[in-house]
């Protein structure tokens, strides 16, 4: 069951990263990845649709996945988005005051990797 959860978590994370970074991908990478991750098509179905080998689809999806993780590791856009959402929730629910909010917001914006 743990393997299934890890696979599901990885798929969900890839889907989120794809939404953030998809404009940095080629058209083919976007097409194959969207069909595989978001539309849940199999490698064979994608290969048939584009008249290419299943291996070519697998290679593209694998490279795209690695690229998405690499982009997040370098740019941290998903992580920053999560921090900003958390900050907004805290200010809306009065868990922090304006001064704390602004200080934390500056830290997120000027965050050094």
Curated annotation (Swiss-Prot):
Gene3D superfamilies: Winged helix-like DNA-binding domain superfamily/Winged helix DNA-binding domain. It comes from the Bacteria. Pfam families: UPF0122. SUPFAM superfamilies: Sigma3 and sigma4 domains of RNA polymerase sigma factors. InterPro entries: RNA_pol_sigma_r3/r4-like, UPF0122, UPF0122_fam_protein, WH-like_DNA-bd_sf. Belongs to the UPF0122 family. Might take part in the signal recognition particle (SRP) pathway. This is inferred from the conservation of its genetic proximity to ftsY/ffh. May be a regulatory protein. HAMAP family: UPF0122. This is UPF0122 protein MCAP_0480. It comes from Mycoplasma capricolum subsp. capricolum (strain California kid / ATCC 27343 / NCTC 10154).
